[in-house]
A protein has these predicted regions:
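Hydrophobic/aromatic ligand-binding patch that stacks against planar heteroaromatic rings
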Residues: 50, 87, 110-111
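Conserved acidic catalytic loop of the alpha/beta-hydrolase fold
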Residues: 79-97
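Alpha/beta-hydrolase-fold enzymes
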Residues: 120-180
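Conserved hydrolase catalytic core segment
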Residues: 94-137
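Short glycine-enriched, charge-decorated loop/helix-capping segments at active-site entrances
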Residues: 71-76
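N-terminal cap/lid segment of alpha/beta-hydrolase-fold proteins
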Residues: 1-23
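Conserved HGGG/HGGXW glycine-rich cap/lid loop of the alpha/beta-hydrolase fold
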Residues: 15-70
Length: 180
């Protein structure tokens, strides 16, 4: 039985900030970075036992300002990708998979756009980004996005995830209505 992480550490990135991370699963398994949602942190492992049996070395960094990671004033999604690259270098990872849960999804999209040569695979699970910008109900919602948000939205569309997000949102809404 896995009682805790294999490793729970802090890396000092180039600008001196603390980037905390924990490793779960199989220490010699295939490396996969898991980008947590909000308000989670590195200590939330989806299922450490299953992760280990699957032969996965799951590395969960705390996003800036979460857990033991320092906040980063003026951070961008591209600067997050740079942090991920520094973490990969420190852990000796040439290539790795990456998956984002919920609010972690946009961070994965940024890594896919910025450091694709480092990634073996990228996945976004249960992300509500598209649902937040329901253009039918909020026609001026795109005006609220900054350049970075537009970049991520363009990437979501380019990857064909927009329709999947709409489908997921509709299924989720139907499920919630069934509970009420």
């Amino acid at each position: 039985m896995t009682d805790g992480p294999l490793n729970d550490s802090v890396l000092r990135v180039g600008d001196g900030r603390a980037l905390a991370y924990a490793e779960w699963g199989d220490a010699h398994g295939s490396p996969v970075l898991f980008i947590h949602g909000s308000p989670h942190s590195r200590i939330w492992c989806p299922d450490a036992e299953i992760t280990a049996r699957a032969g996965v070395r799951l590395i969960i960094p705390d996003r800036p300002g979460f857990g033991r990671s320092d906040p980063q004033i003026g951070h961008t999604l591209d600067s997050w990708a740079a942090d991920v690259e520094e973490l990969a270098e420190a852990l000796g990872l040439d290539r790795f998979g990456i998956v984002g849960w919920s609010a972690g999804g946009v961070y994965v999209a940024a890594c896919a756009a910025t450091i694709p040569e480092r990634l073996t695979a990228a996945g976004i699970v249960s992300n509500r980004t598209m649902a937040l910008y329901n253009l039918g109900e909020r026609p001026h919602a795109l005006d609220e996005l900054d350049d970075e948000g537009r970049h991520v939205l363009d990437l979501v569309r380019e990857l064909g995830l927009e329709e999947a997000a709409k489908t997921h949102a509709a299924e989720e809404e139907e499920y919630v209505r069934g509970l009420v």
